[in-house]
Amino acid sequence: MLGALLLLLIIGAVYIVQVSKIDPPKVADMSALQWQRTDHGNGFYTLKNNWFRHSKSGLYELYVEGEPFERGVVNGKLTAELVVRQEDHFAGQIEKMIPSRFKRGFLKYLIGFFNRNLDKNVTEEYKDEIYGVSESASPAYQYLGSNYARILNYHAAHDIGHAVQNLAMVGCTSFGTWGAMSEDSTMIIGRNFDFYVGDKFAEDKIVAFFNPSTGHKFMTVTWGGFTGAVSGMNDQGLSVTINAAKSSLPTGSATPVSLVTKEILQYAKNINEAIAIARSRKMFVSESFLVASAADNKAVIIEKTPEDLDVYDPKKDFIVCTNHFQSKGLGKTKMNIEQEEQSASSYRYQRMMELLNANGKNSVQKTIRILRDQRGVNNANIGMGNEKAVNQLIAHHSVVFEPKKLLVWVSTSPWQLGEYVAYDLNKVFALKGMNTDREIIDSSLIVPADSFLLTNDYRNFVLFRNMKQRIMDGGTVNTDSLVASNPEFYNSYVLAGDYLYKRKQYAAALKNYEMALTRVIATKQEEDHIRAQIKKIKEK
């Protein structure tokens, strides 16, 4: 019996290894691989009409044009150091999260199984582009798969991460106003992309401008080696941002959400075309696409699950999107009701409605003020870093769009607290190459950094994060100092309680767990953990 089970496991492992092997596409003309970038110094590179630079704002800026494979190759060659560095950061964070080599190996094959048909769900155009970028990937991770297979799989990391962890560190917020709700009636869209894969992963943000051989020109906020889109706007004044919704564990691969978003940006000029593209693609997780269109002068949310699609149109002059569905078709499903009851999404939505109602006529500056808001419902102090806040102090990036004016503001570090710098898509795409290094932001439209950066609270939050990281790394901390650094945050007490419980200091742990219950807790799962720990201590 044991021998038969072992044989079954071996056959299963071989099957997964075989089905997860992904061969690169066959590209007719690969001459772009011979192209070389020109180094002009100070981090400024060019390759034909394409260019890459490091802005004084701290953001990287990239312009790429041409055929799919060429775009990928050029992207990879211009951003080569960032492609390698980003994979290093990603792999390093995975090692931190999963210290066991055996478990990481198992995860590799599990992801391989999920993504066994991934290439069959990606268009030839995007496979060619990803193949081009992958030629600049590091040779150090061949044990995880070929360069092409790895980079392709990374495009599904957002999907698998949010399905496996059920929104852990993927709690985004987006909203928009237009008509009577905006100061000059112009549409304004704001979004926080709260996707956290470690501090280093968020260091090298790229504001990328793409001029593809087919479709529309568009911009995205991205990172090295990633050709998909999570936040972007095209030259038709159509913007797209994505927010994760609750998903069940995927059983097979489909089109990564980021590539569906990119396809909408590249090929849709209005809401109906965006809906048609979203409907045509199979996805293996549930997602909300907030699509704003200058042509339609409104925004809607395309809500999509692996089985269904519905559209939420508020038929008002504003729209709010957190991490639950609102349409008639998908809003009443069992999974969505659970999401509303057990996650931070509904609370954050309620806070957003409060802020909009108190906002008056909206402006870009007011939009950014909302995106930076750390308070809870009724302006409650819920601590710094709470998932129930609009600003959770983990954002990879934050953006504001004015689709009719083709303007976009992008946050600078840290999170959404630094300056928001502005780009005019008309001006950027009119450059037709760049021979000398120069700033492309519109300095007259910069929104200043948040004054919170100058406060003792901010310094205490940095201290809190450092102590939290020390605990995660297995180090020692003073739990009184930990709690004092962020006393209104339930997680301060949970961290202290877990730390003390592990060291068998049960009375002190109990005190912290009980204090946590007096604070605003982000999710039902976390509250259940606290109550379970209290029960275990009392039963000792």
Per-region residue spans from a language model:
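Internal mixed beta-strand/loop scaffold within catalytic domains of large alpha/beta enzymes
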Residues: 150-260, 396, 400, 408-410
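C-terminus-biased signal that marks the final domain/tail of proteins
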Residues: 2-3, 9-163, 265-288, 294-299, ...
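Histidine- and/or cysteine-centered catalytic micro-motif in compact active-site loops
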Residues: 245, 294, 305
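A general structural signal for short secondary-structure boundary/capping elements
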Residues: 220-223, 233-236, 285-288, 307-314, ...
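Short, surface-exposed beta-strand-loop junctions and turns on beta-sheet-rich folds
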Residues: 195-197, 247-248, 307-309, 414-418
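Extended amphipathic alpha-helical segments with heptad-repeat/coiled-coil character used for oligomerization
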Residues: 299-321
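Surface-exposed flexible segments
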Residues: 203-210, 301-308, 417-428
